[in-house]
């Protein structure tokens, strides 16, 4: 047998196998192919590249052929927008616009939607921005506008607080003008913390740490909004050294009348009810109803659950305990402030500011509107996403226009208790406790004989 003849010969009863001494070592990187039609040693076959789409009727890839084109996968939006969400948002925005053109009771009803419209639209844009870049940038632009509006509000209140005529048209001198401009500048500078997350997410070199830790655009926007507005609401108190609304009331006896206008006590109570309706409508949209959640999921996200008899009894007991804690807390805070000689909240000015609510009907309305509205907005929307501490700081800052630091300290501690109640139970229970707490405080403030 020729030692160089490596072919396999057919015999009548099978294949004849060469002797081991006659078999040459195959070259490296080659595979053996036993066939009568092909050489015995071939290069390894070329594996076809992975395809991003099924090949379908594409012929098999042969050596020397160019690979088929690679198609990018189609992007499918998972956040589908429900028509009900569109109807609710358009209705809210339409009411806000029409409120500029209508007066009377109907106009007051429409004007009550302004606050809810701003924050609801911001939240909806944040949800849409999860998969739509235009909505993400629109949400950050809208946040910039909201903080700018808050800065001008602070400027106006500060102007009323330092004006020499009590109406804000004139100021006494350069010092007062400098104070007002400082309030405006520092309030607008509160926008910087809100934009820092957006800058980190820009194409200028981000590490996507927020996404890795679960910090989606929605949570970043909620964080920026809460921090910026918390600082902005406190800015007049920090710079002026006193709450701007109380300072304006002390300078002008007409200020309280100007705030109520021609609405009267009954009109103010109706305005609170109007605002509550719009807040509840905005809340269900702000947590993604019609985008990420259905009705049941929305109520669960807000913590609004059916109250049982047992939970109702627990809420009443917690209300009584919170009232007792409030009395001890106010006593301790007042003595601490007096010991250090710090300025406290003017009780007479507070009573004059809220005198329109010092009736049994006013106590009921405030208990319902403040309890339900604030709990849904703060403990229902913000707390599950940002936690108790940060959401409670925002809740406390909302009262900085009329309360001094001693009263804000009391509000902060009360808010912490309500936040713990919300965490251990639900928003329904915390709303009952909050409403009952405010109801009793208003009843206790009603002058004797009324």
Locations of regions flagged by a protein language model:
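Canonical alpha-helical transmembrane segments
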Residues: 118-136
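Juxtamembrane helix-loop-helix connectors linking adjacent transmembrane helices
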Residues: 172-174, 206-278, 287-369
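Membrane-water interface of transmembrane alpha-helices
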Residues: 183-205, 284-295
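Membrane-interfacial loop-to-transmembrane alpha-helix junctions, especially the N-terminal start
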Residues: 80-86, 134-144
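Transmembrane helix-loop-helix hairpins at the membrane interface
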Residues: 2, 33, 37, 42-44, ...
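Low-complexity, Pro/Ser/Thr/Gly/Ala-rich intrinsically disordered linkers and tails that serve as
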Residues: 11-24, 29-31, 35, 52, ...
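Alpha-helical transmembrane segments of polytopic membrane proteins
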Residues: 107-121, 171-190, 267-280
């Amino acid at each position: 047998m020729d030692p160089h003849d490596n072919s396999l010969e057919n015999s009548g009863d099978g294949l004849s196998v060469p002797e081991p001494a006659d078999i040459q070592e195959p070259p490296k990187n080659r595979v053996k192919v036993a066939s009568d039609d092909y050489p015995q040693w071939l290069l390894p076959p070329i594996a076809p590249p992975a395809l991003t789409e099924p090949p379908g009727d594409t012929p098999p890839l042969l050596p020397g052929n160019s690979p088929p084109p690679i198609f990018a996968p189609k992007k499918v939006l998972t956040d589908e927008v429900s028509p009900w969400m569109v109807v609710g948002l358009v209705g809210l925005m339409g009411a806000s616009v029409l409120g500029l053109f209508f007066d009377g009771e109907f106009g007051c009803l429409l004007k009550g939607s302004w606050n809810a419209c701003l924050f609801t639209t911001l939240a909806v844009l944040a949800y849409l921005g999860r998969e739509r870049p235009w909505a993400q940038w629109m949400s950050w632009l809208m946040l910039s506008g909201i903080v700018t509006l808050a800065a001008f509000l602070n400027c106006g209140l500060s102007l009323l607080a330092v004006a020499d005529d009590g109406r804000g048209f004139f100021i006494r001198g350069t010092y007062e003008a400098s104070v007002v401009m400082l309030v405006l500048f520092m309030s607008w500078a509160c926008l910087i913390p809100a934009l820092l997350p957006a800058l980190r997410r820009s194409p200028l070199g981000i590490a996507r740490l927020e996404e890795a830790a679960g910090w989606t655009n929605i949570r970043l926007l909620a964080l920026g909004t809460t921090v910026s507005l918390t600082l902005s609401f406190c800015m007049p108190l920090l710079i002026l050294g006193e709450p701007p609304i109380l300072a304006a009331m002390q300078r002008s006896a007409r200020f309280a009348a100007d705030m109520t206008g021609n609405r009267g006590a009954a009109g103010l109570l109706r305005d609170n009810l109007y605002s509550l309706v719009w807040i509840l409508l905005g809340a269900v949209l702000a947590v993604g109803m019609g985008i990420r959640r259905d009705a049941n999921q929305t109520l669960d996200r807000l913590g609004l659950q059916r109250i049982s008899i047992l939970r109702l009894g627990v809420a009443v007991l917690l209300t009584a305990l919170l009232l007792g804690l409030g009395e001890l807390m106010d006593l301790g805070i007042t003595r601490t402030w007096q010991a250090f000689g710090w300025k406290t909240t003017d009780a007479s000015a507070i009573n004059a500011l809220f005198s329109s609510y010092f009736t049994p009907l006013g106590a009921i309305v405030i208990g319902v509107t403040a309890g339900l509205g604030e709990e849904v907005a703060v403990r229902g929307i913000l707390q599950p996403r940002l936690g108790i501490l940060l959401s409670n700081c925002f809740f406390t800052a909302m009262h900085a226009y009329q309360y001094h630091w001693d009263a804000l300290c009391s509000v902060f501690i009360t808010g912490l208790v309500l936040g713990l109640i919300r965490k251990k139970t639900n928003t329904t229970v915390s709303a009952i406790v909050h409403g009952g707490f405010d109801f009793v405080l208003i009843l206790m403030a009603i002058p004797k004989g009324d």
